[in-house]
A protein has these predicted regions:
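Amphipathic alpha-helical polymerization modules
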Residues: 1-83, 192-224
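Polar, low-complexity export/assembly segments characteristic of proteins
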Residues: 65-222
């Protein structure tokens, strides 16, 4: 019937938009990974080169932020269920926020994104649509395999929370540092490492970002 076809069309459009946007981000992250490999190889770490690398990182960050806030059919593609305000914003220090919460403070428990106080991140709830697969209920809940997801929180792929990285700093000291899992935030840390001419830290951050890049690729495969 017509409603069924409309639902199917809506699902296809939303998945295509999410896949396309995530592919844009993956390309940008891959470019950064290649850029940083050049920066840490020892022949491109003079101040002029480092400044160029940092400027390129800033341009890439701007592109990632634009992709995160991309719109399709009046809906933020990666904003969860936020259709009214820009989902991904920056504070004065340049930290990335998702629907008002610093991405570094977000955790994921029992299918829910939580802030540092254990409250659900605003507008991050998943929504689903029935396209005739026989929606099955389990009490008040439904089997997600019998419906299609219609809202996506981009942090599922671009990263949230923090992890530890280990490296030997430029003074020869072993360092354990807590860093963001979000690719945007990692790029900001990379800019700091470039400014400090700390190539070991930069390399460790690049390895860390590669893990999140793999998560982005998995997301593209799931959406495709």
């Amino acid at each position: 019937n017509e409603q069924y076809q409309r639902n199917v069309d809506a699902v296809v459009a939303q998945y295509d938009a999410a896949e396309g946007t995530l592919t844009e981000i993956s390309d940008q992250v891959q470019n950064v990974h290649s850029l940083i490999l050049k920066a840490v190889n020892g022949t491109n770490n003079d101040e002029t080169s480092r400044n160029i690398f940092s400027e390129t990182l800033q341009q890439t960050k701007d592109g990632v932020l634009k992709s995160l806030n991309a719109v399709n059919l009046d809906k933020y593609i990666l904003g969860g269920v936020n259709n009214k305000t820009t989902p991904y914003t920056l504070d004065e220090a340049g930290n990335l926020f998702f629907n008002g919460v610093n991405v570094d403070d977000i955790s994921f428990t029992d299918g829910v994104y939580l802030d540092e106080n254990g409250n659900q991140v605003p507008l991050s709830k998943e929504t689903y649509i029935d396209i005739g697969l026989g929606l099955r209920m389990h009490g008040d809940n439904f089997n997600k395999d019998t419906a299609f997801q219609m809202s996506f929180s981009g942090i599922a792929w671009t990263g949230y929370g923090i992890s530890e990285i280990n490296y030997t700093d430029k003074n020869g000291d072993e360092v354990t540092e807590e860093v963001s899992n979000n690719v945007y935030q990692i790029m900001s840390s990379m800019q700091e490492a470039l400014e400090e001419n700390d190539m070991n830290r930069l390399g460790a951050l690049n390895d860390h970002m590669k893990k999140q890049y793999d998560t982005i690729l998995k997301g593209i495969a799931e959406l495709g």
